[in-house]
């Protein structure tokens, strides 16, 4: 019988990677909590209409990439391709936006049916930062500064911030009309996808990945030529706030992002260290999304960090993996030893909860248990055999350096083990 393989484009995250992943997530969580953001968790499955109305019918995501299916009641459901729409829906459903402002973060898997390649997967993970009910460029700057702090905390310097403004609905309409006129003049040069989008949403032609279209797209009208006074003032203040904070950036008038709900500020953090998939974080304002989904007009801004890409960039920039190893591994040898050794290690866990202890389970000779202790990555082995049992003693043997073995009484084990590990210069893992 053949083995069942993982679905193409959906990767397993193995134990040697999860410890580093968790350590990075903890840095993000602590930083967001320090800025007053709270976690929200929303379903990974939503009604398909949520994404059609928010992301936009004429987008690659909705047209080509969503995992959509009918449930047993015939209702169309979709695995979430991004998190913002679900978070906004949750805010509306649960009354979080009634004369309130919310600073939220969330993390979890997203799903898009794309061609799998390095840095682009069909199941991928994002860390989302959302601020609902906040107007003005100050919150835009705060979120961008938070992301900058994340890179700094992880030792990542190979990133560049790109900024643009899409303007208000009125200025976006002017830009759309100019795009339509421009692409109509060059209709014969458009590929089939772009011709289909010309009447429905010409802005999405700018998302084209067709290399034959690049020159045409590069010469298209840009958003900054059509900005209204309000958007100009908003963007100018944002730039001043970033300058004041020492955040370097590049204004990219062709940055539009791939989802229809964006307005005013849009931004991306990009790197040249990961090949074609160089966007690590992207986001912007979506002031019209709540009303678009049936709620009251609510200003908002958010961004998403791609966790797989962030982890890869962390490694490329010299980040060290976090070892998910125990501090101590208990070796118990002899038929009469198991019960008292088991009780001893549980008592030690109560006394010293910060020390990570793995007990050998499943028996085995002294030699085989010591091999397991070494493979576990533990700093020390705790050894108890029949002689130690008779004397109520336990051996502490260093596994990572040649410093011999000492013996201590059971009642002294917690204090002695802490001191022994501290003297070896080993801190708590992770």
Where is each model-derived feature located?
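TRNA-recognition modules of translation machinery and tRNA-sensing kinases, especially anticodon-binding
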Residues: 1-430
């Amino acid at each position: 019988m053949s083995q069942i393989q993982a679905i193409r484009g959906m990767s397993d995250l193995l134990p040697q990677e999860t410890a580093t992943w968790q350590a990075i997530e903890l840095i993000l969580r602590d930083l967001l909590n320090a800025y007053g953001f709270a976690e929200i968790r929303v379903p990974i499955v939503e009604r398909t209409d949520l994404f059609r109305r928010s992301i936009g019918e004429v987008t690659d995501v909705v047209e080509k990439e969503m995992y959509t299916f009918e449930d047993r009641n015939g209702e169309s459901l979709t695995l979430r391709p991004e998190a913002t729409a679900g978070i906004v829906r949750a805010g509306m459903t649960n009354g979080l936006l009634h004369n309130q402002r919310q600073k939220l973060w969330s993390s979890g898997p997203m799903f898009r049916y794309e061609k799998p390649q390095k840095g682009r997967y069909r199941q991928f993970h994002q860390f989302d930062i959302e601020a609902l009910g906040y107007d003005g460029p100050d919150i835009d700057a705060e979120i961008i500064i938070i992301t900058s702090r994340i890179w700094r905390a992880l030792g990542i310097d190979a990133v560049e911030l790109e900024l643009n403004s899409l303007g208000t609905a009125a200025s976006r309409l002017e830009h759309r009309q100019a795009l339509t006129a421009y692409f109509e003049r060059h209709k014969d040069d458009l590929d089939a996808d772009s011709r289909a989008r010309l009447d429905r949403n010409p802005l999405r032609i700018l998302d084209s990945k067709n290399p034959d279209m690049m020159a045409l797209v590069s010469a298209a009208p840009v958003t900054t030529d059509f900005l209204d006074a309000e958007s100009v003032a908003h963007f100018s203040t944002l730039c001043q706030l970033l300058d004041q904070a020492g955040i370097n950036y590049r204004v990219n008038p062709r940055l539009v992002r791939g989802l229809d709900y964006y307005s005013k500020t849009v931004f991306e953090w990009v790197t040249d260290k990961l090949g074609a998939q160089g966007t690590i974080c992207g986001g912007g304002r979506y002031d019209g999304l709540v009303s678009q989904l049936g709620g009251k007009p609510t200003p908002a801004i958010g961004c998403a960090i791609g966790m797989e890409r962030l982890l890869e960039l962390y490694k490329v920039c010299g980040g060290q993996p976090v070892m998910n190893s125990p501090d101590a591994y208990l070796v118990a040898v002899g038929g009469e030893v198991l019960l008292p050794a088991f009780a001893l290690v549980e008592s030690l866990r109560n006394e010293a909860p910060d020390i990570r202890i793995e007990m050998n389970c499943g028996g085995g000779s002294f030699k085989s248990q010591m091999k397991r202790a070494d493979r576990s990555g533990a700093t020390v082995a705790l050894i108890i055999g029949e002689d130690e049992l008779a004397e109520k003693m336990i051996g502490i043997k260093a596994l990572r350096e040649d410093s011999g073995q000492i013996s201590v009484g059971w009642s002294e084990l917690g204090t002695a083990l802490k001191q022994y590990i501290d003297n070896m210069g080993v801190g708590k893992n992770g």
